[in-house]
């Protein structure tokens, strides 16, 4: 499988095992209505991201339950399918029941030149994610805080989202699932 090079941290001159922070990298300024710098995110197209074991913990809220808060293992997979003008688009798949079922949603979000991330996940309930594109363990990672709900129930989860490819062990056995693979989890599409 072709490995992608990720361009993150160019605004700060960050050096990691990533490529693309040199002269000629695509950083474009948009000036309407205010100046917002964005970058070329095409390296993220056709990439998958997942939650490693250490970051599965999330909390579910249910107003009619006792206790109202319950710890859950929240595995989420992102598959970015396109990028345009500083926006990433694709599909997200979430499971809080060890991979027995997956909730698909369409994801649209932006990554600014200073690596601030804002993602919207659209399905029957809107999920909002905010965070940073960072380097963790020498690889790119999304450090995200996610919240979804309708008032009487909801889910809050923070995690590092790491890239995953078919050569990774977790590809065929996602953490927090009963031996579920990325292809199985994403088979329904969004």
Task: Give the location of each predicted region.
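Sec-dependent N-terminal signal peptides of Gram-positive bacterial secreted proteins and lipoproteins
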Residues: 13-15
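Generic cytosolic/nucleocytoplasmic N-terminal low-complexity/intrinsically disordered segments
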Residues: 2-3, 38, 97
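Bacterial signal peptide processing site
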Residues: 22-25
């Amino acid at each position: 499988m072709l490995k992608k090079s990720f361009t993150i941290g160019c605004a700060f001159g960050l050096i990691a095992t990533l490529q693309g922070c040199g002269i000629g990298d695509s950083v474009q300024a948009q000036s309407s209505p205010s100046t917002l710098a964005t970058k070329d995110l095409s390296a993220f197209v056709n990439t998958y991201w997942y939650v490693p074991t250490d970051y599965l913990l999330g909390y579910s809220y249910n107003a009619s339950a006792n206790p109202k808060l319950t710890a859950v293992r929240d595995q989420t997979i992102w598959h970015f399918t396109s990028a345009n003008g500083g926006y990433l688009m694709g599909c997200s798949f979430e499971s809080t029941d060890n991979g027995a079922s997956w909730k698909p949603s369409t994801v649209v979000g932006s990554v600014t030149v200073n690596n601030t991330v804002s993602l919207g996940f659209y399905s029957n309930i809107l999920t909002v994610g905010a965070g940073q594109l960072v380097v963790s363990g020498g690889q790119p990672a999304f450090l995200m805080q996610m919240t979804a709900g309708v008032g009487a129930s909801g889910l809050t989860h923070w995690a590092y989202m790491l890239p995953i490819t078919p050569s990774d062990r977790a590809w065929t056995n996602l953490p927090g699932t009963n031996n579920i693979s990325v292809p199985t989890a994403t088979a329904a599409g969004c």
